[in-house]
C-alpha cells in the first residue's frame, strides 16, 4: 500500500472558516433581537430566536445567498490555510445546498482563500463525503458532526469552540479557540504522524 505524503484536510465552511457570528446581524434585524454569539447555546437557532423551524427555513431561503456572499472570514483563517495549501489538500465539505455552489466558490475567490475542492452535500451528514475524499483530519463547528466523524473514522476532528457546541466529546475531538491554536495543534499532529 502506498502512503500518501500529502494530508487531506477536510473543512466545514459555516462557523468554521466563516465567523460563527455571521448570521447574527441578519437574524437580529429580522426578528427584532439583540443576540450575541454567547447567547447562542444550541446549534438549532430556532431555540434562541423563539420561532418555528418553518419560519426559520422560510427566512433562510430568502436571505442565505446574501449572507453567504457577505460572510466574514474567521479571524486568522486565511494565513493558516495559505500555509497549509502548500503541502496539503484543502477539501471543503459543507451542508450548503448545491444551488449555492457558484456563490460559495466566488466567496472563496473574493476572500483569497485557497481550496482544492468544495463539496456542497446539502445536509449536515458529511460522512459519505469524508469517506469518498479519504480525509485525514476534519475541522468542524457542529458538535454532533464532530463526534460522528471522529467516531466513524478515528481521525482527529478540530472543533472550533463556540457556545453552541460545548458538550462532551471523545478524545480525538480537539476543542480549539482560534485558527492559530488549530495550526499549532496540527503542526504537532503532523510531526507525530511522521510528516
Swiss-Prot record:
MF annotations from Gene Ontology: 5'-nucleotidase activity
The UniProt record lists the keyword GTP-binding: no
InterPro entries in the record: 5'(3')-deoxyribonucleotidase, 5_3-deoxyribonucleotidase-like, HAD-like_sf, HAD_sf, Nucleotidase_putative
SUPFAM superfamilies according to UniProt: HAD-like (SSF56784)
Pfam family, one: NT5C
Segments traversing the membrane: none
Swiss-Prot/TrEMBL GO biological process terms: deoxyribonucleotide catabolic process
Keywords: Hydrolase
EC number: 3.1.3.-
Protein family (similarity comment): Belongs to the 5'(3')-deoxyribonucleotidase family.
PANTHER family, per database record: NUCLEOTIDASE YQFW-RELATED
Name of the protein this chain belongs to: Putative nucleotidase BH1399
Source organism of this protein record: Halalkalibacterium halodurans (strain ATCC BAA-125 / DSM 18197 / FERM 7344 / JCM 9153 / C-125)
Amino acid at each position: 500500500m502506498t502512503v500518501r505524503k500529502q494530508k487531506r484536510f477536510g473543512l466545514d465552511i459555516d462557523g468554521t472558516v466563516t465567523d460563527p457570528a455571521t448570521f447574527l446581524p441578519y437574524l437580529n434585524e429580522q426578528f427584532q433581537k439583540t443576540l450575541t454569539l454567547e447567547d447562542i447555546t444550541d446549534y438549532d437557532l430556532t431555540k434562541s430566536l423563539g420561532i418555528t423551524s418553518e419560519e426559520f427555513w422560510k427566512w433562510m431561503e430568502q436571505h442565505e445567498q446574501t449572507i453567504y456572499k457577505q460572510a466574514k472570514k474567521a479571524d486568522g483563517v486565511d494565513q493558516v490555510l495559505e500555509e497549509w495549501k502548500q503541502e496539503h489538500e484543502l477539501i471543503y465539505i459543507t451542508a450548503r445546498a448545491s444551488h449555492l455552489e457558484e456563490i460559495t466558490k466566488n466567496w472563496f475567490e473574493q476572500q483569497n482563500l485557497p481550496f482544492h475542492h468544495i463539496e456542497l452535500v446539502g445536509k449536515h451528514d458529511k460522512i459519505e463525503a469524508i469517506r469518498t475524499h479519504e480525509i485525514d483530519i476534519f475541522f468542524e463547528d457542529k458538535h454532533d458532526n464532530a463526534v460522528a466523524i471522529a467516531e466513524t473514522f478515528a481521525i482527529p476532528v478540530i472543533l472550533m469552540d463556540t457556545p453552541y457546541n460545548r458538550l462532551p466529546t471523545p478524545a480525538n475531538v480537539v476543542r480549539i479557540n482560534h485558527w492559530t491554536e488549530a495550526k499549532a495543534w496540527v503542526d504537532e499532529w503532523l510531526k507525530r504522524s511522521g510528516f
